[in-house]
Regions:
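Hydrophobic transmembrane alpha-helices of multi-pass solute/ion transporters
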Residues: 1-78, 82-102, 238-247, 255-318, ...
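Transmembrane alpha-helix interface/packing and boundary motifs in multi-pass membrane proteins
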Residues: 18-23, 109-121, 152-158, 262-267, ...
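Juxtamembrane and boundary regions of transmembrane helices in multi-pass small-molecule transporters
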Residues: 22, 159-160, 171-237, 370, ...
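Juxtamembrane helix-boundary/capping and inter-helix hinge elements in multi-pass membrane proteins
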Residues: 45, 61-62, 140-144, 169-182, ...
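Hydrophobic alpha-helical transmembrane segments of multi-pass integral membrane proteins
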Residues: 71-73, 99-131, 340-383, 404
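Alpha-helical transmembrane segments of multi-pass membrane proteins
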Residues: 101-113, 140-159, 348-361, 387-417, ...
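Re-entrant/interfacial helical elements at transmembrane boundaries that shape
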Residues: 123-134, 164-176, 335, 368-382, ...
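Central hydrophobic cores of alpha-helical transmembrane segments
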Residues: 125-132, 150, 273-283, 354
């Protein structure tokens, strides 16, 4: 009987997952699943409506700071895209000239840096795909390697960027500061970027590709008009960035991104980092002529706030409500018991949390759906089953947040039916109709995805993460499974 009650309590998760798999937006699926969770909690635990509302509101209160971060993040993304920060980053790299042997690795690095500035992998891919695919066409590079490289690079900033919605949401669900997340995984993320770049460069040179030089202007001029029109429909902001790249913006417009990174490295609060980016993009943009007036710049801020409030903030409020109700009735206890029956130590538990993220991503076919569905489960698995100091427990929550984000974003690149891949294929067919792309084209050459997903799981399980600065998990006996603690006490009593 206990099994069936536990399964019934967990059924709201199945409903949320099923609705999202069917294609329903999370903004609709989450409220429906939440109402169902209210009903289940009332039946199984005899909880009153007011009690459920109170626990739901209390859970959402913890996300208030996250909501402000999301608004500022969207505002900074708008300002960076419109004032020329993104275009300056692209031009700095492209004006050096490219060959068939370097187009893939340069595309990888440019999209990696640009995605940090814009906070969006989809927007970065849409903006850079026309440039690098037509550059690749001109110099005679390998189209599949270049495509997969910019796909992997575009995911870099979506996993570690201050203004990435997946970074902010995954951190909020685990109740960790975004800036702490970035600092804890920074060396690992940059290490993955460097290792992947080296591998891509080696692959390019092993293909015996030509060494003729081309530039971005030629590539953009080569893009057919109908392609630009199709891209405007798919991602209008990408067309604006392409035009800025073609017309040129001063190189110093990249300084706002540098300032944001420097402030972040200093460890200042996330809101201050984002504010520095917004203000500096206005000041430098005014000097460069990319900002027409204070009024027009404030319109960008308004657009950013509106974008955050129209979906992601409302979605997170419902997800927070859902998580509060599920926790109130101990809905995750059966899953916790199943995982704990297999985990022999904290590292194995954390490794299984990573596997849960991958499984959720594959099942839901959406990285944000995985983050909001699996995130509360992995958080409760740690909080209910691990003992340690507040500092050590915080480090475990940081890894859970990194799992949710990294295995959501990079994991998506290895799942053929994922919405990420579907979006990429749509962009590719629009901007480069000379090749018929399929999902495996992106997957088999996506070096960054393989390196990131494989390394974080292996490092977590083996304990080799201790060799990466700030990335190591606390070891036993500093953190211990509660069941192991009980077993040790029982053994001492017997002795």
């Amino acid at each position: 009987m206990g099994f069936w009650i536990g399964l019934f309590k967990f059924s709201p998760v199945f409903m949320l997952a099923g609705l999202m798999i069917s294609g329903m937006d999370c903004l609709i699926a989450a409220p429906i699943a939440t109402v169902y969770a209210f009903i289940v909690a009332a039946i199984t635990d005899k909880l009153k409506f007011n009690d459920l509302v109170e626990c739901a509101v209390d859970n959402v209160k913890h996300l208030n700071l996250v909501f402000f971060i999301l608004m500022f993040a969207y505002a900074m993304a708008e300002s960076f895209m419109s004032t020329g920060v993104g275009a300056a980053i692209v031009n700095i790299a492209l004006n050096l000239g490219l060959t068939a042997r370097t187009v893939a690795v340069v595309g990888f690095l440019v999209t990696g840096i640009l995605s940090v500035a814009t906070g969006t992998s989809w927007g970065t891919f849409a903006a850079c795909a026309p440039i690098f695919l037509w550059l690749n066409h001109i110099v005679g590079g390998n189209i599949l390697l270049t495509t997969a490289s910019i796909a992997g690079g575009a995911c870099f900033g979506d996993n570690i960027g201050l203004i990435s919605d997946t970074t902010v949401v995954s951190s909020g669900i685990q109740n960790v500061e975004v800036i702490d997340r970035i600092r804890s995984q920074g060396f690992w993320s940059v290490g993955c970027l460097i290792v992947s770049a080296i591998i891509i460069f080696i692959i390019s040179n092993s293909m015996g590709l030509p060494t003729d030089v081309a530039n971005a202007g030629l590539a953009i001029d080569a893009i057919p008009t109908e392609v630009m029109e199709a891209l405007a429909v798919e991602r209008a902001s990408a067309v604006d960035l392409l035009n800025q790249v073609k017309e040129g913006v001063p190189y110093y417009m990249a300084i706002p991104l540098v300032l944001v990174l420097l402030v972040a490295i200093k460890g200042l609060p996330t809101l201050i980092c984002l504010s520095v980016g917004i203000v500096s993009s206005f000041l430098f943009g005014s000097f460069a002529g990319t900002v027409e007036s204070l009024s027009s710049f404030l319109d960008l801020i308004y657009t950013g706030f509106e974008g955050a409030g129209s979906w992601v903030i409302v979605m997170m409020m419902w997800v927070g409500t859902f998580g509060g109700v599920m926790s109130k009735m101990n809905a995750f206890k059966p899953l916790s018991n199943a995982v704990m029956s297999l985990a022999k130590n904290v590292r194995q538990l954390m490794f299984m949390n990573g596997l849960l993220c991958i499984a959720g991503n594959a099942a839901l076919s959406d990285e944000m759906a995985q983050i909001v569905t699996v995130g509360p489960i992995t958080r409760e698995l740690v909080e209910e089953n691990v003992e340690g100091s507040e500092e050590d427990m915080y480090k475990l929550r940081l890894r859970n947040a990194t799992f949710s984000d990294a295995l959501g974003v990079f994991g998506s690149q290895l799942i053929p039916w994922h919405v990420y891949i579907g979006f990429y294929l749509g962009i590719l067919s629009a901007v480069y109709p000379l090749h018929q792309f399929v999902a495996l084209d992106i997957i088999k050459y996506n070096v960054m995805a393989f390196v990131a997903v494989g390394s974080i799981l292996i490092l977590t399980l083996t304990g080799w993460d201790r060799f990466i600065p700030k990335f190591g998990l606390p070891s036993e006996p500093h953190v211990r499974l509660k069941k192991k603690q009980k077993q040790d006490k029982k053994s001492n009593v017997t002795a």
